[in-house]
Each structure stands twice: as structure tokens, then as C-alpha cells.
Regions:
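Short hydrophobic "strand-cap" motifs at the C-terminus of beta-strands
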Residues: 328, 500-501, 529, 556
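Substrate-binding clefts and catalytic carboxylate motifs of secreted carbohydrate-active enzymes
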Residues: 496-509
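Catalytic cores of eukaryotic secretory-pathway lumenal/extracellular enzymes that build
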Residues: 553, 557-559
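Donor-sugar nucleotide-binding helix/loop cap in glycosyltransferases
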Residues: 576, 590
Length: 696
């Protein structure tokens, strides 16, 4: 093999076999060349490429590195070396190597593009965006750079600019599928729903099996109040293996009181969770799946573990001896969480705590938003910030305890907490289950909703407050003007069972109980909160199938003022809770308005909030442990007016003294919990479960 002609011929054969995908044959020729010429540049480079194709990136890096020793200006080798570093997860080195490759003019654009992709992989979005700009400054016709720039801009919340970038790509290639698909996501961010549907059709005409686009189309149909079309698109996406589509198909059928396929959908959800498919954790909670399944769903949703980023450097406390608490939420707007938390925020002890608000949602102009903003010592809107930048801001502010009021719900930003926004991170109020995140240290709960024996199913350490964990606004007024039953569309005589829960909380087994109660109690009606007309129609049909006139189901319209909504509870006789997902704020509203609630305690956090609220309200006798007992108790209260009146009087007498409505007491317990968490952190102890002792 020392003859140059023989080496050249061997190289020719090696390249041909390599191009044909016959890697074993190509490898033999490369090896033979290197046996004769150990520093043969092309053989070193190509064998390195071959090793990378085989998945042996470490050996590929060694071989390509050897090739570069003999020709450091080889553009292909420089790019391959950088790309191999990226494959090995050595991103910082890869970026430096791409910079070297970019310095070789022959492939400057390609190297800069690869560098930008590496920055995307690292989550360094702003730098990636700048890198794509560099590529386009050299090659304005680089379609992939336009598309990737559009994707980055969409992720950064700059969807209008993203559309412009994607339209540039489509000017060069009108049928480019990736550009058309990316355009769907930008339009969806802008909530330009009609255009989203048009864009989806363009993609699906070229690629009818695009499950993600079917999923986006389904969500848009749902937003536009076209449930039949939405469910059909979710079905199509699920058939293509899109498990998040399964999640929403199941949830929205439940929302529409369509129970025809509940058993099959629940079985599919369980299979998906067991197979570690991406099932929305909230859906597992809504269907009352086992705590172990809720944990697995949450972990998978986050990516089979938290993927926590390295801890941020936390800012100095600027000489303050106050504990700095940051509440983080996408619900600082017209939302149940905002109404529940506001009284606690306003009452925090400012002599010992500095309270900071971090909003993940824009200002909706509501009165509660203004009140929320004013309740904080400092308030920051980070809607347009990246997760890393939001976490850095909190670190610079010296936040010691960060409280996640979302969990995996709409608008959540777990990436902020994954970047360790604070040394101590806590889940509270917004999500009645585990987040599944190893970067959330604690969950605030109570002994009823979350006994310590549930710790194996929670990634967070459980912290017990002495009473009901749920915060409430005890400054709310109940209108003194009680509307008549006739005004409310209710019969003037007869017993009124009431449940103002959202429709997805109404399960078939509970509805069975309700219909038996209506059959047993003469002239009784069931007063529900207004829901989608299909849900109302389906419930009417289900009632008729159980022998109950659908006209005995009466639906209350939305009340513009909270005080009027609370006041109309006086027209009802008894609130019936739901299972497996209890009423939470809704049940507490009923109790605040003076309406007794009957609940059945379930097997999950979400199914035990009613029990916790009733115990804290001093009415443990209204808590049952089975649907049979729940039905019997509701029936007895309806049949014995004196017994029901006794419960009503007891509720009224304790309204200002019971633990449920003592926000100062809750505040002292929550502050004690934060203090203990911080003391454990300062002492170097790992987070551990503990119980807060009662404080008067």
C-alpha cells in the first residue's frame, strides 16, 4: 500500500462504499489506508464520519481531531469536529469549535448555522437568535435559518416578528413544510384563530399525518366553540400516537358530560402513563387516577425527571433581616387562585417578610389584578422574559423562598424553578397534586388532604399546616339583597340541591347519586352552574335515562358581581360536592355564604379538599367516606329540616371564628412554614417533611 496509486485507488473504493451505505466495506479500506499512511487526512476524516454514523462519537472525535492536526484549515473536518462535540453533549466546546470552523471562509455560513443550532440546544435563545442573524447577513436566502429564527422568535413571545421570518422562508420556497408548520404555531400564539385554521389546512393538505398540527387545529376549534370538530381532530391526532391529544380528548368529553367512552379513555390514559407517554398531569387528577399514576404523569410531563438547570447564584440580601418570599403565578388576573390568595398576601407580616409578586400573565385590567399588584412590596411582570432571565431576576432580588402557585396548569413556567430561582422552592394552592419536580422542595398541605403516608407519591416534601391549607378572601361581601327563587329561575317550593362546580368535575357515579336523590325527594331540583349547551343537553339526556325529568336540572347564569353570586347561595338548601375531584374554592364560597355542604372524601388530594374545608369550618359531621354514606346523609338532611337548619346555624355561628375563615391564623402558620424551610436551608439540611404547630 506504499504506492501512491494504490492508496488513491483504495481511497476511491472506500468513498464509493461509504456513499452506498456499505459501512463495513468502507471501514476496511479506510483502515488499510491508515495502516500504510497513519496521517492520511481524508481517511482519518472519513473514518471519523463513519464512526459517528455508527454511534461511536468518542472515536469519531479522536479521528477527526487527528485529521485536523494535519490540516487545521479543512472546513469539512472543522465542522464535523464541532458537530461531534455537540453530539457528545460538550456544548461549550462545540460552540468554540463552530467559531473556529466559521473562521474558515469556505463554510462560514454552514458553521455559523450549526453553532446557532448548538445554542438552541443549550437553551441560550437570545444568542441563538443573534447567530441566525449572522447566518442571514452572509446568506439571506438560507431558508433553514429563516425558519429557525422564526421558531426562536415564537418561543420568545415575538410572534409577529416570527411570522415575518417564516414568510421570508416561504417567499423562497412556498411549499416548505417546516415553514408552513412553524407558521401555525406563531399564529396560534397570536390567537389569530381563523388564520390558524387556514394555516393548518395548508400543512395537512401536504402532510395529513401531522399529529401536532391536528392537535393545534383541535385546540383552535375548541376555542372557537366548535366542540364536534375539536373532538374529531383530537381523535385523529390520538390515532397517530399524540398522547397529549388523548389527554384533552378525555378532559373535553368529561367537560361536555359525554360519558359514553369514559372507561376506554381512562384505560388509555392509564396505559399512556405506564408507558411514560406525555399525558397532561391535570387530566390524571381530574379523573381521580391513583396518586402513583399522578406522580408518574407529572414526572413524564416534565421530561422523565426535572432536567433541573444548575443552581443560580443568589443575590445578597442587601442588609435586610426580612425573609424574602416571591409568589409566582400565571393567575394574577380574574381567576380563582387570585381571589383565594389575595387576603393572605395583604395580611403578611411586613416587619418580618418582604413579599414579591412575579406575574406570568399580562394585566387583564380586572379589579383583582390591581388589588394583587398593590398587595406586594414589589411586583414584576416576566411574561416577555425567558425562564433563565426570570430566574436570574429573582436571584438578583435576593428571593429566599419562591412559591409556585401554578403547578402543571395552564400558563405554568416550570423552567423558572428548574433554574433554581430561589434556594427554597414551594408548591402551594394552585394544583392539588404533586408537581413531580425535583426542583420543588416542599408542598404546603394539611393532614386531611395529604396525610404523611402519601409521601412516596409526592416528589416534594409534605408540610402540614394545622388547619385547612386553602387560603380564602374573608374580606368579600355577601350582598344583603337576596334574590327570590323566582328571580333565579327556581321553583318557589321544594328542596334545592346545589352544585356550582365546573362540568368536568361531575362524574357519572356522582350523577347517579344526585338523580336518586331527586327521585327520593319530592319536588326537589338540582341547581347547577351554567355550562356549555352540549354539556347541559347531555346531562338532561342522562337525567332522563335515569327516570328524571330534565327540567328538574336548572342552570344558573354567570353573575357579574361576586357578592351577588355569593348571595344567591341563600336560595339553595344543600350543596352537593363532587368526586373524584371535589369542589375547592366553590365549596368554600358556599360555606362563606352560609350554605351547608355534604362531601365524600376520596383517595387523592383533589378529592379530600371538601373534607378539609368542612373540618376547618367545624362541620366534620358533613364529611362522608363512601358514596353510599354521602347519599344517605344528603337524603337525611333533605328529609329532616331541623337537622339541616342546625347545620346552617352552626355554620353561621362559626363564620368569623372557625379556622377556615381565619386568614390571620393561616398567615401565621404559612409564615412559620416558610421560616422553618429557610432555617433548614441555612443549616445545610436537606428538605424534609414537617408539621407546623398551631399558633393562636
Amino acid at each position: 500500500m506504499r504506492d501512491d496509486a494504490i492508496v488513491a485507488e483504495a481511497a476511491e473504493y472506500a468513498v464509493k462504499f461509504h456513499e452506498l451505505g456499505k459501512l463495513a466495506e468502507a471501514e476496511k479500506f479506510y483502515a488499510a489506508i491508515l495502516a500504510a499512511r497513519p496521517d492520511h487526512f481524508d481517511a482519518l476524516h472519513q473514518l471519523g464520519v463513519l464512526r459517528r454514523q455508527q454511534g461511536n462519537s468518542a472515536e469519531a472525535l479522536r479521528l477527526i481531531g487527528e485529521a485536523l492536526k494535519s490540516n487545521a484549515r479543512a472546513a469539512d473536518s472543522a465542522r464535523s469536529f464541532a458537530a461531534t462535540l455537540e453530539t457528545l453533549g460538550r456544548y461549550e466546546e462545540a460552540i468554540a469549535a463552530f467559531d473556529k470552523a466559521a473562521a474558515i471562509r469556505k463554510q462560514r455560513s454552514e458553521a455559523l448555522f450549526s453553532r446557532a443550532i448548538a445554542l438552541v440546544t443549550m437553551g441560550r435563545q437570545q444568542e441563538a437568535l443573534a447567530a441566525f442573524d449572522e447566518v442571514l447577513a452572509i446568506d439571506e436566502h438560507n431558508i433553514e435559518a429563516h425558519i429557525n429564527r422564526g421558531v426562536m422568535l415564537t418561543q420568545l413571545g415575538r410572534a409577529e416578528e416570527a411570522l415575518a421570518a417564516l414568510d421570508m422562508a416561504l417567499e423562497h420556497e412556498p411549499d416548505h413544510l417546516s415553514a408552513l408548520s412553524s407558521r401555525v404555531f406563531a399564529l396560534a400564539k397570536l390567537q389569530r384563530h381563523a388564520e390558524v385554521l387556514d394555516a393548518c389546512e395548508k400543512v395537512l393538505a401536504r402532510n395529513p399525518g401531522n399529529a401536532e398540527i391536528l392537535y393545534i387545529r383541535a385546540g383552535t376549534f375548541w376555542t372557537l366553540d366548535k366542540p364536534a370538530e375539536a373532538l374529531d381532530s383530537y381523535e385523529q391526532a390520538w390515532a397517530l400516537g399524540h398522547t397529549r391529544a388523548l389527554s384533552l380528548l378525555a378532559l373535553y368529553r368529561l367537560t361536555l358530560a359525554d360519558w359514553t367512552s369514559t372507561d376506554q379513555l381512562v384505560a388509555a390514559l392509564r396505559r399512556g402513563i405506564a408507558d411514560k407517554d406525555s399525558i397532561y398531569p391535570f387530566v390524571a387528577v381530574a379523573f381521580g387516577l391513583a396518586p402513583s399514576e399522578q406522580l408518574q404523569a407529572a414526572r413524564t410531563f416534565l421530561g422523565n425527571g426535572s432536567q433541573a438547570a444548575p443552581a443560580s447564584r443568589h443575590g445578597a440580601l442587601a442588609g435586610s433581616d426580612k425573609l424574602r418570599i416571591a409568589y409566582v403565578s400565571s393567575d394574577f388576573r380574574q381567576h380563582a387562585v387570585a381571589h383565594a390568595i389575595i387576603d393572605l398576601l395583604e395580611r403578611h407580616d411586613r416587619s418580618r417578610f418582604e413579599i414579591i409578586g412575579v406575574s406570568l400573565c399580562p394585566d387583564d385590567g380586572s379589579a383583582i389584578r390591581a388589588r394583587i399588584v398593590n398587595s406586594f412590596d414589589r411586583f414584576h411582570d416576566v411574561c416577555s422574559e425567558t425562564d433563565a432571565d426570570a430566574a436570574s431576576l429573582m436571584s438578583e432580588l435576593g428571593v429566599q423562598v419562591a412559591v409556585d402557585l401554578n403547578g402543571p396548569t395552564q400558563g405554568c413556567r416550570p423552567g423558572i424553578f428548574a433554574h433554581r430561582a430561589a434556594p427554597v422552592q414551594v408548591a402551594y394552592l394552585g394544583y392539588p397534586a404533586t408537581t413531580g419536580a425535583d426542583f420543588i422542595d416542599y408542598i404546603l398541605a394539611d393532614p386531611v388532604v395529604l396525610p404523611f403516608d402519601q409521601q412516596p407519591f409526592f416528589s416534594e416534601q409534605i408540610v402540614h399546616l394545622p388547619d385547612c391549607y386553602h387560603a380564602n378572601d374573608t374580606t368579600r361581601l355577601v350582598s344583603p339583597e337576596t334574590p327570590t327563587r323566582r328571580d333565579l329561575g327556581l321553583p318557589e317550593r321544594g328542596f334545592v340541591f346545589c352544585c356550582f362546580n365546573k362540568s368536568y368535575k361531575i362524574s357519572a357515579p356522582v350523577f347517579d347519586v344526585w338523580m336518586r336523590l331527586l327521585a327520593r325527594v319530592d319536588d326537589s331540583v338540582l341547581w347547577l352552574f351554567k355550562m356549555h349547551e352540549l354539556a347541559q343537553s347531555n346531562l338532561g339526556r342522562e337525567a332522563q335515562a335515569r327516570g328524571i325529568d330534565p327540567r328538574r336540572l336548572i342552570f344558573a347564569p354567570y353573575a357579574a358581581r361576586i357578592e351577588d353570586h355569593l348571595a344567591r347561595h341563600r336560595a339553595a338548601d344543600l350543596f352537593l360536592d363532587t368526586l373524584p375531584y371535589n369542589a375547592h374554592s366553590t365549596a368554600i364560597d358556599a360555606l362563606w355564604a352560609g350554605l351547608p355542604v355534604v362531601t365524600c372524601a376520596g383517595n387523592t388530594f383533589a378529592g379530600r379538599v371538601g373534607a378539609s374545608a368542612l373540618e376547618a369550618a367545624g362541620l366534620p359531621e358533613l364529611v362522608t367516606s363512601s358514596l353510599e354514606d354521602y347519599e344517605a346523609l344528603a337524603s337525611k338532611l333533605a328529609a329532616e329540616p331541623a337537622l339541616l337548619e342546625s347545620a346552617r346555624r352552626k355554620l353561621a355561628a362559626g363564620r368569623r371564628t372557625c379556622a377556615l375563615f381565619d386568614t390571620d391564623r393561616l398567615r401565621r402558620h404559612v409564615e412559620a412554614a416558610y421560616t422553618t424551610m429557610w432555617e433548614l436551608q441555612r443549616s445545610g439540611e436537606r428538605p424534609r417533611s414537617f408539621q407546623v404547630e398551631p399558633r393562636q
